[in-house]
Amino acid sequence: MSGVLPVRARAQGVSPSLAGIDLLQVLGDGVVGAPESAPTLRDPGRIARWETGEWRYRITSGARSGQTEVESLALISATARGETWKRTIGQESTLFLREVSGGGLVLPSQVTHPHQALVYFEPPLSYLIAGLGPGESRTFDGRMDVYSVNNPGIKWYTGRIRATTVYTGVYRITTPAGAFRAALIKTEYQIDIFAVVSVKDTLYTFYAEGIGKVAEAEHRRIAAMGLFNSDTKVGKVLVSYTPINLPTRVESP
């Protein structure tokens, strides 16, 4: 079955404590602070600052600890799949997204640069979900088709993906760019390919209204039967954000 399944939200109130969540330790001491009251996410694009701009992050753990990673967001001409936004995440990946009714965003395709892979999601993968109440979740089930980015006519494989997104609550987050009241979105991905390769990816992403993503902790586990296994944890915190003002369009008379 493909699509998105809802889970009921809890009433608005103080967000649950994040104490005991080991993954958040990769962000460093003093980053994640006290829980605060959490409203419904009526406009996730506003919380995530879905506008052209550039965000610079400091990597706080893993092999690249101390390095800077740049993320950018840009408008593009509509593609054949209706994508009108491009989000570039360092040298790791480029996401192509489109807006949907109600204020959310979906991810029809992405490029994973280290593997030179072009990935199509069917149906498009939920990316930002409008209307989530605190504690509410959505589960997405779908298919992913993976092609060579250098030769899109060559299909490498097909897999299944399940994504569970939870709006956990709102928390005080302190980064080199400042202190923020930030909404926490937890996303868990389960990817299975040929019943041979299994990928489990967990992300805790903090968004501050008017700024966008201010911190993120990720735990990725890859198991390939009889081939290899990997287990990596990466944290990043915001250092700076620069909006990019697009030139005003002048219509011909």
Predicted regions and their residues:
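N-terminal export leaders
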Residues: 1-2
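Acidic, serine/threonine-rich low-complexity disordered tracts
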Residues: 5-96, 148-253
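Contiguous hydrophobic, core-forming segments of folded domains
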Residues: 80-148
